[in-house]
């Protein structure tokens, strides 16, 4: 048992999906895992362990933002021995050619957060995905005929900021695919503790095409492509 997770030793698999929304974790457990058992309800951050195609897999919500995912990922890695962590979440498109419901695999994640700089004030460290997971996820998505983009994303500390909104659009002109709030922290912890990390996002809205949008219920229950890719990537040899 850790500070924020009530699981006992052995109740969490060494590979895990990390949606931001705890209700999406519940949805994944109920619709994709066999014999799923809930191992955490602390702060309503639901976590489950079950099997997917015969492989033991866990799924747990992380909440929104870099501080929240940092807490849960840190404890999963250091207290429960998790070795593969894949974020499955939503993002806003910054590119004209990246549309709602399409997938983005974050090759790297820039960030305006200063949290990583607490550890490394002298450097701006690049936060990158584990290449093995990235490569597997890309080929799995292609085999499943899913429209998939690979590139940089922005992990932002702010959701509502008119000033950052215009700056984020400029990042899109530099090829940044989308904006979200967690990937950079997950990648940093992967590098720090020597585990494999990847972020797979579904585009839920677009900053360049505002008419493209999805509802909260759709974001919770219908973005199944990234869930399939995430699970297949976790169990791929």
Swiss-Prot record:
Catalytic activity: a purine D-ribonucleoside + phosphate = a purine nucleobase + alpha-D-ribose 1-phosphate; a purine 2'-deoxy-D-ribonucleoside + phosphate = a purine nucleobase + 2-deoxy-alpha-D-ribose 1-phosphate
Annotated catalytic residues: 205 (proton donor)
Family: Belongs to the PNP/UDP phosphorylase family.
GO molecular function: purine-nucleoside phosphorylase activity
Gene Ontology BP terms: purine nucleoside catabolic process
Site feature: Important for catalytic activity: 219
Pfam (any one): PNP_UDP_1
Protein name listed in UniProt: Purine nucleoside phosphorylase DeoD-type
Amino acids binding phosphate: 20, 24, 43, 87-90
Signal peptide range: none
SUPFAM superfamilies per UniProt: Purine and uridine phosphorylases (SSF53167)
NCBIfam families for the chain: deoD, PRK05819.1
PROSITE patterns per record: PNP_UDP_1
Subunit comment: Homohexamer; trimer of homodimers.
Domain of life: Bacteria
E.C. no: 2.4.2.1
Keywords: Glycosyltransferase, Transferase
Transmembrane segments: none
Organism of this sequence: Streptococcus suis (strain 05ZYH33)
Residues that coordinate or bind a purine D-ribonucleoside: 4, 180-182, 204-205
Function text: Catalyzes the reversible phosphorolytic breakdown of the N-glycosidic bond in the beta-(deoxy)ribonucleoside molecules, with the formation of the corresponding free purine bases and pentose-1-phosphate.
GO cellular component entries: cytosol
């Amino acid at each position: 048992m850790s500070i924020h997770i009530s699981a006992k030793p052995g109740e969490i698999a060494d590979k895990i999906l990390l949606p931001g929304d705890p209700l999406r974790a519940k949805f994944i457990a109920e619709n994709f895992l066999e014999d799923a058992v809930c191992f955490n309800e602390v702060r309503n951050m639901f976590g489950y362990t079950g099997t997917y195609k015969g492989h033991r897999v866990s799924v747990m919500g992380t909440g929104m933002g870099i501080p929240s995912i940092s807490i849960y990922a840190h404890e999963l890695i250091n207290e429960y021995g998790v070795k593969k962590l894949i974020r499955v979440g939503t993002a806003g498109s910054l590119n004209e050619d990246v549309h709602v419901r399409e997938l983005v695999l974050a090759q790297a994640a820039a960030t305006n957060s200063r949290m990583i700089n607490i550890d490394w004030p002298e450097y701006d460290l690049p936060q990158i995905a584990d290449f093995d997971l990235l490569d597997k996820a890309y080929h799995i998505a292609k085999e499943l005929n899913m429209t998939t983009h690979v590139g940089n994303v922005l992990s932002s500390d702010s959701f509502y900021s008119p000033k950052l909104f215009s700056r984020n659009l400029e990042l899109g002109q530099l090829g940044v695919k989308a904006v979200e709030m967690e990937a950079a922290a997950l990648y940093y912890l992967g590098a720090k503790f020597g585990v494999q990390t990847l972020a797979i996002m579904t585009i839920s809205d677009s900053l360049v095409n505002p008419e493209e949008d999805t509802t909260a219920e759709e974001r919770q229950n219908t973005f199944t492509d990234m869930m399939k890719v995430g699970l297949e990537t976790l169990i791929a040899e």
